[in-house]
Amino acid sequence: MTKSELIERLCAEQTHLSAKEIEDAVKNILEHMASTLEAGERIEIRGFGSFSLHYREPRVGRNPKTGDKVELEGKYVPHFKPGKELRERVNL
């Protein structure tokens, strides 16, 4: 599901809100989550999961086009850990 598909679905379910209000709400939530992670903080949504940053160590990679070795710096990457309720819900 894309962001625009999410907005469309919410518009269909929440007919008392305008499409602009829903779009703004979704964008604000995502922006707030991104800035929270950017600040190094963890996000926990009970029953859904948590978002945090994991450090990826520096390593030697390869350029897929040329096969040459490339030094990759260490960096923080976003990580999502699903909560128990979500894991149980999607485990068909």
From Swiss-Prot:
SUPFAM superfamilies: IHF-like DNA-binding proteins (SSF47729). Heterodimer of an alpha and a beta chain. This is Integration host factor subunit beta. This protein is one of the two subunits of integration host factor, a specific DNA-binding protein that functions in genetic recombination as well as in transcriptional and translational control. GO terms for cellular component: chromosome; cytosol. The lineage of its organism: Bacteria, Pseudomonadati, Pseudomonadota, Gammaproteobacteria, Vibrionales. The gene is ihfB. GO terms for biological process: DNA recombination; regulation of DNA-templated transcription; regulation of translation. GO terms for molecular function: DNA binding; structural constituent of chromatin. It comes from Vibrio cholerae serotype O1 (strain ATCC 39315 / El Tor Inaba N16961). Keywords: DNA recombination, DNA-binding, Transcription, Transcription regulation, Translation regulation.
